[in-house]
Amino acid sequence: MKKIKNRFIKLFMAICLVFVSVFAFTQANAISVVFAKTNTDSEYVNTITDLKTTNLMGGVTLYEQKMTSLLNGDKQKAFQEHFVQWVDLASYSNANVKLVTWTKQSMDNWTAATTKVCALDWEKNHPGWIVIAGTNGDFFSNSGDNTKEPTNNFMADGDMYRADYVGGYRGVVGINGDNTVVVGDPKLSSNMMLYIYDKDGNVAEKLPISGYNTAATSDGITLYTKDCKDTYDLTGYTVCEGVYTICRVSNGKNKTVFVKGEMGLSRPGKTAEKPYQTREEIEEDGTSKTITVREFYIATKNQEVVNKLKSGVKVKCQYDFVGEWQNVENSVGYIHQMLQNGTSLNQCSTDSFIYTDHPRTFIGFKEDGTPVLMVIDGRGSSTNPVKKGNYGVSLFEGAEIMKLAGCVNAYNLDGGGSSTLIARNENGGFDVINRPSDYGYERSTGNAIFLVMRDPAVETVSGRSSASTISIKKKTTDYAKSVTDIKVTVNGKTYEMESDEVIATGLLENTVYDVNVEYKLNGELCKSSYKASTNMYDPGVDINPTSKGFNIGLRQSDENLITSKVTIRVE
């Protein structure tokens, strides 16, 4: 009996050993299949489709391609597929293109809008400029208080909408006026600053603000906004009343504020002071109605300051960037850097935010500072045709793909249903290029980031162009009417637009050319560019019967005729 038991145990162990060996062999082979050699410079990324490129305005190029990538860069995982789309520039340092941020304008509160609506709003507030392409921006408050405010520091056009920042892995991309960037934790002034503007809109003076929505200081300047929770005794102070055009209060730890507006009357302070957004007004019949007043107060005992805040003077109250951040004009927050000096971070991460395959929006920069805006679709579903075959990526996969796009540094913007990439179309509107995971519909987000350029003020007349010429005419918009001294350069030859049209000649058939434009606006030299193409030459003939025979005509005549002889054979 004992021998039988021993034999059984040996047999059982042998079977187990065979099973383990077979399992290990099959697993090793499975991994070798999954992790086979890729067709890109990354061992974690494959391309499925050919790269589709579209030339946009200003030298910006749109790229679209379907790819697969190894989930989380983990060899125990599988390659998953997704659509990838991004925009960049061939030469950023010499380009007339700028990188900017924006939020849909609202006087009183934070607001959300789709990336397309935000682009239109940016153009509305920047006449003479156009958006070429862009994506959604920072994460924003869309649950809980649902304020729609960005969750990190945010500046647009030099206006510090939200001075609060988080820090650490939740950093900020700051964009300087010369298109260079600074990244990390922003450096801010210790005090808010009161900007006082002259009649031409230039900053005449900047003064430190000692406090806001708090008890006034006898030797300083105190700001009060509509969000002030308490009333304050301002007897002995002069209260300079203002009407704001924008007022924002952050819900961050510092509750920072931003105010922009115009000063009104100045008066002695009272015992219980507080500005309001709306007030109740009593009618002659005794009824009341609500009127919008949009008040802010500046309280001070300094008469020199009061004299500078005369009625009609425009002002701004905000924190400033300082140090290496002092030239930043636009900023946007991110959560996690993914690519650092050419090295992809977070491989095989155990942080679910990092390793989960989501739709993602990224901003990255090449060695020369050229920006790349990318969206990768995700949240694949067999029941949702928009998302089918789109799984999304971890941050490591995104870093590998951004590296393939030429980036050396990259950062993760808001993703999921927010991920949206838009591009300007030929009709002056915007197309959504990617496949948003909310069943193809754009989500409204807190802010956006765009590549923008000067409006060229001219356009191509395709019907008047030929196989060797491009017809360019001045636009009929109000902006175009305000510009002078237009010069157009095509293929190295410059044409002065003395009338409303010039024709670039001596060009090659069916060829794309850069159209470089210079003009003056109020004495300032402005530059812009776009691409235009010559037509395909049609060497055919048309034969039209008449009562006396046939009329034979060339379908297309040109200064450089390809067809010089026509032979007709009639059987």
Which positions does each model-derived feature cover?
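Short, flexible loop/turn segments at beta-strand junctions in immunoglobulin-like
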Residues: 504-508
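Short beta-strand segments within Ig-like beta-sandwich modules, predominantly Fibronectin type-III
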Residues: 493-499
